[in-house]
Amino acid sequence: MTKATDIRTKSADELNEQLLQLKKEQFNLRFQRASGQLENTARVREVRRDIARIKTILGERTRSAQPAS
């Protein structure tokens, strides 16, 4: 599990790369769960929440970069 403070120190490029890796892992976990091969079911939840954390921080950055109108 990645902490929000660790995510905030990374650049946008690093976050997008990590987001892509997490989405690939989520895809693989989904198939493992469907075929009954998934051993660590808690990892599905961790990955989903890590994706949400990264998307939230990226959204905060884009909103703060835009001037208020």
Swiss-Prot record:
It comes from the Bacteria. PROSITE patterns: RIBOSOMAL_L29. The keyword Lipoprotein does not apply. Disulfide bonds: none annotated. It holds the Pfam family Ribosomal_L29. Transmembrane segments: none annotated. GO terms for cellular component: cytosolic large ribosomal subunit. GO terms for biological process: translation. GO terms for molecular function: structural constituent of ribosome. InterPro entries: Ribosomal_protein_uL29, Ribosomal_uL29, Ribosomal_uL29_CS, Ribosomal_uL29_sf. Keywords: Ribonucleoprotein, Ribosomal protein. Belongs to the universal ribosomal protein uL29 family. PANTHER family: 60S RIBOSOMAL PROTEIN L35/50S RIBOSOMAL PROTEIN L29, LARGE RIBOSOMAL SUBUNIT PROTEIN UL29C. This is Large ribosomal subunit protein uL29. It comes from Rhodospirillum centenum (strain ATCC 51521 / SW).
